[in-house]
Amino acid sequence: MKISKTLFKNLTRCKNFSGYYDIYINRTFSNVKVVDNNINMNDLDNIDITSLDENTEILDSMFDEETGEDLLHVSNAQLEAFQSIYVEVEKLAIEYARSLFGDSIKSSEETKNQQYFEYITEENNYYCYLDGYQEEEDEVNIFEVKSTTSRKFDDLHLTLRTTKNYLGDKKALFIKNKKGIYDFVAYDYLGLEYNNKIITINDIEKAMEKLLDPYSDVGKYIYDVAIEKYIIENSSQNINKKVNYYLIVLNHEYTLENENCKYVIDKNGQSLFKVYNISIIVEKLHTEIAKKKEELEYNLRSLLINRNQIGKCCEYKKTTQCVFFPICWKKLREDGSILEFLNKRFMNKSDKTKSFNVFELANQNIYKIKDAYEYIYENNNYYQYKCIIENSEFIDKERTRWALSQIKYPIYYLDFESYNSPLPRFYGEHPYSQSLFQYSLHIEKEENVCNIEKNHKEYLAPDHLDHRIDLIKSLIKDIDLTNGGTVIVYNENFEKTRLKELAEIFPEYSRKLLNIRSHIFDLCQVLNGKGKMYMGDLLYQKNKKELPTFAFYNNNLHGSFSIKKVLPVFSDLTYSTLDVKNGTEAILTYGILPTLTEKEYQEKYLALRKYCRQDTWAMVEILWNLKKKADF
């Protein structure tokens, strides 16, 4: 079998992947030896109807029975939206590497033309293509480009606890050298005295845990390169030179200053990219990769499937979520599953020395909230359990009324839409800045007097040029806080952060933008109780040990307070009839505007306007109906 780097990562997720992959590729159980410890489906003389149904169900979960359509393939919307930009990132990253290492780095935008290595065994052919490859007289440099940012790497530190509550100063794991490359320096600290303690190998290994974890936000990139290293070192193309491994990522500290002369070093001396020397780290993973390769080959030979194998390797809700997630997690995707618990740590009431995560409960065949009572130890989960058992709705009317009493008229319901391009587009932006291109505003001057069309204001950038000042001017004009008022948003972190960013980039509008920011009221916090919403509610503060954090809960929320989940509980309003149905589709639609015909453009432009308007009108309906439920 030909096994790419990506397939290697998938086949080593868990023992089940190989069996499911064989079924998926061949559309048959002919090679699978065990399914949930039942007899092979092909041994029809010894199989009962229950086993047959169970196995057919797996195949039916992969392909539509009538059309044969692949039910597991889900497109990556973010990848689609920014595909051309990712290509540009790789191109610019290699250009930057050449400025540091010389022009001899081999690279290509076409994968087939990149440097290729393969490792052939009796059973499989492991192969990889390299983003950048440079062979010098005494050494080889290998470059992997990732369209992520440097923040997660720069945030890694070695920290020693000096007292029970004080961690002391931090020591960075990566430090920039004279050539502008970030070296891994953790081992340089070994034996040094730090905060009156001697740094030991255990301290260093503790600091490296995330780097060596293939499922952490930094470790997954290291693991990628470690697989490349294993293939290269075992390939027939003997290098016989020292090999250095480098990871190139976007610099989160870089600020675009001149749109006409893009990506030059900014005024703070920051480049668009950072290069990390990860040679020492991938060497630490060499034995682990070799072990994984042996497990992979054993699993491909045995093709065993056991449903009770879920864990962080499934990468639940990540863009890298396992393709077979719908099969393994089927019982957990049903209404009322333990995935809906707001707190996903559990403790057995009869043995409070051990805690469990949601994976461990599921692997013990506990899938439903109603069956998890013995493992509930905190208020949020208990009240969710109570709502399920009693089929009831929870609302803390007194607390909700207290929150609603903070709202002053006129009310401005505000929602932003943004485009988080990997490459900064406009002055003052960083990689992945949430660049605003649209807002929607519903205005309720008097209580319960607001019309979806008549009392609506909006702004939508007509193209991909910089229209932020136009948006700011329009926003300031539409939100009149001269005589007070409230700006209602849903999840304040987003709107507050965007307003603060605009105020910093355009200081001439800072005072008015920050005034809008200071009047923000988070409708989501009224429901979920997070943030500072109820800190001033003295009655709640007195009784909160007996109450859940949230002030409202309905089983139809399914453990989420997102506006898409909350809206159906309070209103018949739906997004299903809209051409643009969610934020991801809004990004995709905005992204393609310059490529459309005039007719297509008008249709998509209108679709974006309707979608954003729906978000603010949804807040209107939620607030009005919440008032009724709270008798306010």
Which residues make up each language-model segment?
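Metal-dependent nuclease catalytic cores that hydrolyze phosphodiester bonds in DNA/RNA
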Residues: 1-142, 148-186, 343-380, 386-393
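Acidic, Mg2+-coordinating catalytic module of metal-dependent nucleases/exonucleases
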Residues: 214-221, 227-230, 244-250, 260-264, ...
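Two-metal-ion RNase H-like nuclease active-site motif
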Residues: 110-117, 409-420, 522
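A short acidic (Asp/Glu
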Residues: 154, 256-260, 422-427, 496-505
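Conserved RNase H-like, two-metal-ion catalytic cores of nucleic-acid enzymes
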Residues: 90, 94-99, 142-144, 149, ...
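Charged, glycine/proline-rich intrinsically disordered loops and linkers
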Residues: 49-66, 158-213, 268-281, 285, ...
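Conserved DEDDh/DEDDy metal-dependent 3′-5′ exonuclease domain
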Residues: 112-116, 129, 134, 138, ...
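Long, internal scaffold/assembly segments composed of regular secondary structure
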Residues: 319-425, 429-433
